[in-house]
Amino acid sequence: MTSTLLAEQSDSPVTPQRVLEEVFGYQTFRDGQQEVIESAVEGKDSLVIMPTGGGKSLCYQIPALVRSGITLVISPLISLMKDQVDQLKANGVAAECVNSTMSREELLSVYNRMHSGQLKLVYVSPERVLMRDFIERLENLPLAMIAVDEAHCISQWGHDFRPEYAALGQLKQHFSHVPFMALTATADDATRRDILERLRLHEPHVHLGSFDRPNIRYNLVEKHKPISQIIRYLDTQKGNCGIIYCGSRKKVEMVTEKLCNNHIRAAGYHAGMHADERAYVQEAFQRDDIQIVVATVAFGMGINKPNVRFVVHFDIPRNIESYYQETGRAGRDGLPAEAMMLYDPADISWLRRMLDEKDDGPQKQVESHKLNAMSAFAEAQTCRRQVLLNYFGEYREKPCGNCDICLDPPKHFDATEEARKALSCVYRVNQSFGMTYVVEVLRGMQNIRVREHGHDKISTYGIGRDHSHDYWVSIFRQLIHKGLLFQNITRNSTLQLTEEARPLLRGDVSLELAVPRLDTTARAAKSDKLTSKNYDKKLFAKLRKLRKSIADEDGLPPYVVFSDATLIDMAEILPTSYGEMLAVSGVGQRKLEKYADPFLDLIQEHITHHG
């Protein structure tokens, strides 16, 4: 076990910093990691909201190696478990998973190792962890901690609610003495509160990290000839790994066929394919044998591939959480990446029709609210990153400079009068109605609902009739993005004033908004180089080739050996000794022993021939 090895190497105690450096090969913690880890080491419950690629896994993996006993990790997908276990083993950590694909003999072997104290982390599905026989096994084990990954699946307000996750509160009740850590990258305020309540966390340490992924460029383009648009885009991404998401299996097959017909090597992936076919595509993508996967949302949650350089949405997702999660599969190594969406308002209309066919109920209301927010993001006239972060309750003061809106900004105007009309109307209808209704009142629409509520008699009725419905919708969405209005998901998406709205209503301040662009125009973002670091590009290419060869021999994805970010560090630092190699980010003691020699030889040879 890694903790044993660490103890053997010196008399000093096993600390989070030692584990970070010697096992995982990093010198410093990322934002928020240290506080979360220290809280877990002390035995406290935690809720961790951290962006994809922000280092969530280390938040429970490091405490697992510091605390005595076994850490149980509850994860929704077998592929995700396997990927995490492969990476831990590559770092010398004793880890295994328990899943439905394993034979009885394999399961018994893992159980024996659990009971003999040979394992530090065990990954398991929520379905299995709640089985009576498994709980009985756990009762006889020294549990260090229980981590619940993808914790948004617990909440009815989340975008991916799963009943088996919601039942995990029973586990906390059963093991009340064991510290729990719930982790997710996608949870708005309502979802966060629901996770805390359903999981029954006791006085938890709550870490709400920034949702910002600054290395990802967000770009929306008007969809007109989607296949041609994608082919032109892929032409700018030669040699890079990427995922193209489609809204249906039929589209996956169509797009894959068109790309292959245009001599672009791509593979399709959807739930209708045979399990062996899906496994082959996923494995080939992980190992860099396939560069592009065209997929439904069935693909991705189990992907921890750090060097995905782009994610394309052929169709708009149903909610911002899905968009954030799917685009978050790009650039997990921290290097520049791009998220491009082909947007057609008709796609939103189609999703609304699909939603209308569902039975009325709380879940339908939640889905409707989330679809409205996704539509607002797509039609945003302000910095897309600001809109995205605002949805998760995070406010960014300055535009990002790294989205299509910032790179090709819309025109702005003094919208003080329009904003005051809009906010006043929300106030006059007692902050009890949704956006469509308030716009109807503003525009003086004659309908039964407005008359029944007596809102055809209020002072703001009809004061906005000089502008179209779409114009006012754009104004309201911008006011939400600016934090002057709040759309309450738990009260039928009603509009409510925030404290920030008061100075504007009193006439103390003015406000600029974007002139509503009522027809979407294509805005292409300029492409970035991989990184601004000053590294040797030829050496980097050689290092990647060597990594692929070693990974294929070991039957591993290349990034499990070393990530692209680590190879770039090597190509910049040019290490020629073990000591210098340990200074490279991502090189720990186990990887140094296992992989350093061929990389050091290659670097020395390159220096000799190229100076």
Go through each PLM region and give its residues.
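Short, charged low-complexity linear segments at domain edges
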Residues: 363-392
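Helicase motor core with emphasis on the C-terminal RecA-like subdomain
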Residues: 9-23, 27-31, 35-57, 65-67, ...
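Accessory DNA-binding and partner-docking regions appended to nucleic-acid-acting proteins
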Residues: 1-19, 366-368, 397-611
